[in-house]
């Protein structure tokens, strides 16, 4: 998918990058058109927790952009939280398929329409 991480790689990032179209389809998840994507938001000073829509664009290079199927939801260590827009079984299934229920290297994850 031509992804170049901007942060030091870790097992979660490696898992997301190595997830292919076939793997997603085998998991019952549709692969997105190129016009869709998401950002993994790292919980760090350069990538503040909160809404990406309020994050200054100049701060985005310190985050980690990854191309993933479309959906919008929030994930944190303790529980799923309903976001302002779409929260669906698709989001839950997609994130739990890729990351698993207990393995979080990133505290906040948001999937959204580009």
Curated annotation (Swiss-Prot):
Contains 3 disulfide bonds. The keyword Nucleotide-binding does not apply. It is found in: Secreted. One of its GO terms (molecular function) is toxin activity. Transmembrane segments: none annotated. Its main location: secreted. Keywords: Disulfide bond, Neurotoxin, Secreted, Signal, Toxin. Belongs to the scolopendra neurotoxin 8 family. This is Putative neurotoxin 7. It comes from Scolopendra mutilans.
